[in-house]
Amino acid sequence: MKILKVNYLIILIILISGCSSVPKNTADSCSIFNERYMWYKHAKKAEKKWGTPVYLQLAIIKMESSFDWLAKPPRQKLFKVVPYKRPSSSFGYSQAVKGTWKQYKEETGNKLAARTRFKDSVDFIGWYTNKTEKILKVSKKDAFKQYIAYHEGWGNYKNYKNNKKVINLAKRVEKQSNIYKQQLSECKNSLSTSKYIIF
């Protein structure tokens, strides 16, 4: 009986690691989706639901968490040495903070959403960018301004021109978004073909 339990535990660990590990090549959207085909289905579903392009979803996740499902902001340090508290409650693929994640769950009815799930994370990004378009009149195809709103929040968006750091980050997201867009145009036909998947 103990051997059976151990075997089940090993299988469970393998399944979890297979689902949660960072894709091997996060710079290539085709490679990401070939390795994690269900991610493609989830991203396409979010795109259809909210109108947020798949390539923008990926670019935001790459910048925010590098596709690490357990990503958190690094701890601040006291006297540059002693580990201290984290600067925010950002967590998971989307790096959503607790308050905004709570708002997302309440507004969408997705009560069981988890920041560690890719499916929920891309849906969150779709929801957020859609609200950005409504509140700030920023197109969901404008990766630069969408990321600024994502990073700074809707209230602080108007002050971004004085923030060189966030401007540089947004430029990187815009560049990565364009790269992902080009890559997806080359593999979308093969990705759209039904596949049998394990993970």
Q: What are the functions of these language-model segments?
A:
Residues 21-193, 198:
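Catalytic glycan-binding domains that act on GlcNAc-containing polysaccharides
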Residues 3-12:
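Sec-dependent signal peptide recognition
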Residues 15-18:
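C-terminal motif of bacterial Sec signal peptides marking the signal peptidase cleavage site
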